């Protein structure tokens, strides 16, 4: 097929119309989702993606970067296929953008065998399911909404309730404990958080730039000439970013770019070797939001609450690719921003149906000073089942939920009549529920710089033992404050004894 060259006919914000002259049977128009390249006057290449065919010889495209400086009549070159992402050992420890270019200032990436970002989900006969729990070391999650290996997990919450901190703690705990590989897609979030995440990962050794670079970083420098590329390939994570300042085309596609990298690692295992990949997305709502912006720019009629009419289709197409096959598993953790704390908004509501476990963060719990601010009654998990987690774990989890639910029902009576009007049995329920509620908190390693308290990871046996002791009344004599921001029940008992001694003085 002969190469055809188009020309820009119209630019409206991030939407670029491209006109192809003399298009006949031999010279085909670029297909939907094909990438086209525009050479800017400064020599840099702008990638645009075909979204619509309008008229006979014109395609409407959405830009993956700023369209500043484009003019009508500039030449546009089809690439002959969709946007692709580089693959292999070379991308370990690297930062990439939506089109797979490195954005960390280091050497450029080789495109040999690159994967297209628009791929079909695996065939039905290739899928597998694993009924195995992925323990995180976070008490409230492991006890009440355990995560499934190879499952999809959603962290729901409004603005500023701790979704990103929880995702960073999960990366810290799981990536260190589970020696597999992680992929992080930053979708429409703050650039500062991406910068913090990179520094945090270099410090913790999840990304390895080498000792010489680490020493220069600790002195306040950022000298990329000191990066050891042999060490870099031992890194356990790749980062793909399309942040808040990017145009909507980039934010809508960067989740697919990150997913493509995760799929490439899942499928790269040798025969008989299973790869377990962790895929973090922060934030899946921004993917929907960017899709809504693109939809409006392309002139589609909006649907409920102003979202795109194709919301469920776009979400389904992406979520169906996040799955486990015979070659390996992808366990995904997705932060979901909840606009105005309304879980019935179409964006979070559409995401719900794809998930195996949901962790709901609640502003009312942050107001009590309990972190992570997980709502234990609103959060759910498909695998909280005695056949999977064991009878003892299941029984303790159900008892915790029952006592918290009963406490919630009694709050109305307390607010009107006061604690004195409760029966002795109900007073006991409220006192134990308040201890349980506080024991669901714990200090995080990633928040240590703010709190000054070292983070802890708590094993599932210690978690079950601690909650069982509270429910059985073995620690009723300790003050409530002893259970706040501690790891194991032993720490709570020690803290409680100190508080009692101080009270006597």
From Swiss-Prot:
GO annotations of cellular component type: plasma membrane; proton-transporting ATP synthase complex
Recorded catalytic activity of this chain's protein: ATP + H2O + 4 H(+)(in) = ADP + phosphate + 5 H(+)(out)
Domain of life per record: Bacteria
Keywords attached to this entry: ATP synthesis, ATP-binding, Cell inner membrane, Cell membrane, CF(1), Hydrogen ion transport, Ion transport, Membrane, Nucleotide-binding, Translocase, Transport
Binding residues annotated for ATP, in chain numbering: 157-164
Enzyme Commission code: 7.1.2.2
Record InterPro entries: AAA+_ATPase, ATP-synt_VA_C, ATP_synth_F1_bsu, ATPase_a/bsu_AS, ATPase_alpha/beta_chains, ATPase_F1/V1/A1_a/bsu_N, ATPase_F1/V1/A1_a/bsu_N_sf, ATPase_F1/V1/A1_a/bsu_nucl-bd
Subcellular locations according to the entry: Cell inner membrane
4Fe-4S among keywords: no
Membrane protein topology class: Peripheral membrane protein
GO MF assignments: ATP binding; ATP hydrolysis activity; proton-transporting ATP synthase activity, rotational mechanism
Pfam families named in the record: ATP-synt_ab (PF00006), ATP-synt_ab_N (PF02874), ATP-synt_VA_C (PF22919)
Chief site of localization: membrane
Function: Produces ATP from ADP in the presence of a proton gradient across the membrane. The catalytic sites are hosted primarily by the beta subunits.
Family, per entry: Belongs to the ATPase alpha/beta chains family.
Subunit text: F-type ATPases have 2 components, CF(1) - the catalytic core - and CF(0) - the membrane proton channel. CF(1) has five subunits: alpha(3), beta(3), gamma(1), delta(1), epsilon(1). CF(0) has three main subunits: a(1), b(2) and c(9-12). The alpha and beta chains form an alternating ring which encloses part of the gamma chain. CF(1) is attached to CF(0) by a central stalk formed by the gamma and epsilon chains, while a peripheral stalk is formed by the delta and b chains.
NCBIfam families: atpD
Protein name: ATP synthase subunit beta
Name of the gene encoding the protein in the UniProt record: atpD
